[in-house]
Amino acid sequence: MKKITVLGAGSWGTALALVLADNHHDVHMWGHRQELIDQIDEKHENHDYLPNVALPASIKATTDMKQALEGTDAIIVAVPTKAIREVLKRANELITSKVPFVHVSKGIEPDTLLRISQMIEQEVPDEKREAVVVLSGPSHAEEVGLRHPTTVTVSSENIEAAQFVQDLFMNNNFRVYTNPDVIGVEIGGALKNIIALAAGITDGLGYGDNAKAALITRGLAEIARLGTQMGGNPLTFAGLTGVGDLIVTCTSVHSRNWRCGNLLGKGYKLEEVLEKMGMVVEGVRTTKGAYQLSKEYKVSMPITEALYHVLFEGKKVDDAVESLMARVKTHEMEDLVNMFENQTK
């Protein structure tokens, strides 16, 4: 049995705490809202973020980060991208031993264009960080909380750390694979939120299955183009953290990004949507970062570019769709073939 600290008491952090508790680990959750923490610790539920799920009574929750981190064997970072640096700065002052950091958020920092593993490496010094491990894949917290079969991938430059995390989480309901391609896993997980926003828009506009199928397929091509240019393995995007995560996020009402896009497609303004949802929609921030990365790496990402114009420049959603359909004709597979050929050289 290991002591595992989960930083973050949202839906995903809570669901993963449940998996770890099912595996008989000593799970300590940290959050900053006393009312929510009391709900988890005393009533064994998280009605705000994971309703209708009974949490194991063994899960402990606290607002005292020092208490949560004391003697821990691993730290699960389960806070939104925009809060990661602040939380890590606090944790860094309290960590007394070298432990692996497992991040489960999906995004890109807009100001620096860094992946989350790079942010952790900046904020936590080597003497306190055994390794950085990414956990990603098609995994709605709502279904994990109900113990429905779920499969994810863990990735790290340190294979032993990846296998350690694999063993922490693996059980009959939660299958875990390893993949050494950290860049590909992170980019796939982050950018699928952009395509999910766009998929929600097409559904909100009532365009039907044809449009969404094309959007998902061409969206995957965009993700793979940028991810490979940044150093990822193109095969990763055909796996759980690529096409797998893309499918689940673009087609499910559980997806915050899909729901956000759906409301945009129905005519709501972005500010109205975010206020109405009352939850973090990572795809909005990620769109800004991915748009900038596409310019930096000189990669064609027409869906991302169109969504950027909708979110941040006020372009109408139906005009954005029209501009995508009116693009200059091109070959479907040429760039993907070149991508694989370059990988094998």
Curated annotation (Swiss-Prot):
Enzyme Commission number: 1.1.1.94
Top-rank lineage group of the source organism: Bacteria
Gene Ontology biological process: carbohydrate metabolic process; glycerol-3-phosphate biosynthetic process; glycerol-3-phosphate catabolic process; glycerophospholipid metabolic process; phospholipid biosynthetic process
Any Pfam family the entry gives: NAD_Gly3P_dh_N
Pathway annotation from the record: Membrane lipid metabolism; glycerophospholipid metabolism
Positions annotated as active site in the UniProt record: 192 (proton acceptor)
Gene Ontology terms: cellular component: cytosol
Protein purpose: Catalyzes the reduction of the glycolytic intermediate dihydroxyacetone phosphate (DHAP) to sn-glycerol 3-phosphate (G3P), the key precursor for phospholipid synthesis.
Record-given protein name: Glycerol-3-phosphate dehydrogenase [NAD(P)+]
Organism: Bacillus pumilus (strain SAFR-032)
Name of the gene encoding the protein in the UniProt record: gpsA
